């Protein structure tokens, strides 16, 4: 396996730091810390360069808060924009291509060019093979991010990274808290890399033709229910021995067409695909909010709110839901604000 060296100097180059700031500030240009860096970028870029070059960088303290994510309360860890979040982007600018090449095709969490809807297309394609996809094993890992073992994660990173200076920086970030903190830009990649050996073992050693993973949510499709039950035992053993992880006890083996595969925000059946109930509910709530308060909302928020759900619905069989809620009034609101502000009307382009 090829190991990469001489990466660290690329990470702390001023050109890379400038690119990292450009990427990290997207959607955040009104934040006070971003404005601070924007006011004198070269000053702050040079500070980061010195921190990295002289190895004086120390991970900042986290701001920890609770957020409700799809009905689950999660502890979210937030770092300051300067220097931490810029430094995370500095690292990823250089190592992302190296890490992504090690991942299987059917993992979809937070990877460029492999979003949720890439996974949706792959699952739909798999379900065309009806005989081999009669049953589904669905499972996830118990407290995945908090349970990631630092020593194991470091060994995984060392398999691809030879550069001792870069490993020092990665270790500084990894050891800043227990497990891997949800909210860090690097964390989503650490999570993917941590489970990558499981992915390859399932695909290559266990010959799982239809295996899909999003973060720690996993789906395997097969023609034999008993085969999937045995596979679940093998996976639990692999996770325990190799990664010091446990499967949640809520794993399920079920017929695909009886219940549908609840995955990636959809419910998949052989002949059709539905939006997950929670997604449909949020869409309805958003449309009601727009109708009630559209005069006080920013036009961009109204249009992006409608079009983001259209992006979800175009992959599902939910035409009646769309045309019930994207009605004459919503089309009129979109047309009114676009004519008033002299901007194009994406809702009109899609719905007429």
Roles of regions detected by a PLM:
Residues 1-46, 349-352:
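Non-catalytic, polymerase-adjacent accessory regions of viral genome-replication enzymes
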Residues 89, 229-230, 247-352:
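Right-hand nucleic-acid polymerase module
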Residues 32, 66-67, 91, 123, ...:
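Mobile genetic element proteins and their domesticated derivatives, centered on retroelements
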Residues 51, 106, 121-215, 219-235, ...:
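Conserved polymerase palm-domain catalytic core
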Residues 41-73:
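Active-site-flanking structural segment that lines cofactor/substrate pockets
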Residues 236-245:
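A common structural junction motif
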Residues 27-36, 60-86, 102-114, 172-192:
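Short, conserved non-catalytic motifs in the polymerase core
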Residues 2-7, 14, 92-149:
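Active-site-proximal segment of RNA-dependent polymerases
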């Amino acid at each position: 396996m090829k190991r990469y060296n001489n990466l660290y100097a690329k990470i702390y180059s001023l050109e890379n730091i400038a690119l990292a700031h450009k990427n990290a500030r997207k959607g955040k240009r009104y934040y006070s810390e971003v404005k601070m860096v924007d006011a004198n970028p070269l000053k702050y870029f040079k500070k980061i360069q010195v921190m990295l070059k002289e190895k004086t960088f120390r991970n900042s303290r986290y701001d920890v808060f609770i957020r409700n994510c799809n009905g689950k309360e999660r502890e979210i860890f937030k770092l300051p924009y300067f220097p931490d979040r810029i430094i995370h982007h500095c690292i990823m600018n250089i190592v992302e291509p190296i890490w992504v090449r090690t991942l299987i095709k059917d993992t979809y969490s937070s990877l460029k060019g492999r979003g949720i809807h890439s996974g949706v297309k792959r699952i739909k394609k798999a379900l065309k093979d009806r005989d081999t996809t009669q049953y589904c094993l669905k499972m996830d890992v118990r407290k995945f991010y908090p349970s990631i073992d630092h020593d194991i994660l470091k060994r995984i990173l060392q398999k691809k990274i030879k550069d001792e200076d870069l490993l020092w920086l990665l270790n500084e970030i990894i050891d800043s808290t227990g497990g891997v903190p949800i909210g860090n830009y690097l964390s989503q990649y650490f999570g993917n890399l941590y489970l990558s050996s499981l992915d390859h073992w399932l695909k290559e050693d266990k010959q799982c033709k239809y295996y899909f993973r999003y973060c720690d949510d996993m789906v395997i499709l097969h023609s034999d229910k008993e085969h999937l039950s045995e596979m679940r035992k093998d996976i639990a053993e692999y996770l325990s021995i190799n990664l010091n992880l446990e499967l949640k006890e809520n794993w399920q083996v079920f017929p695909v067409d009886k219940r549908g595969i609840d995955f990636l925000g959809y419910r998949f059946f052989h002949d059709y695909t539905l939006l997950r109930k929670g997604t449909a509910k949020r869409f309805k709530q958003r449309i009601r909010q727009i109708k009630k308060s559209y005069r006080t909302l920013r036009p961009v928020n109204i249009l992006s709110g409608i079009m983001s759900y259209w992006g979800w619905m175009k992959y599902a069989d939910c035409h009646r839901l769309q045309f019930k809620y994207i009605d004459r009034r919503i089309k009129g609101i979109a047309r009114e604000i676009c004519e008033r502000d002299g901007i194009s009307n994406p809702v009109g382009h899609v719905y007429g």
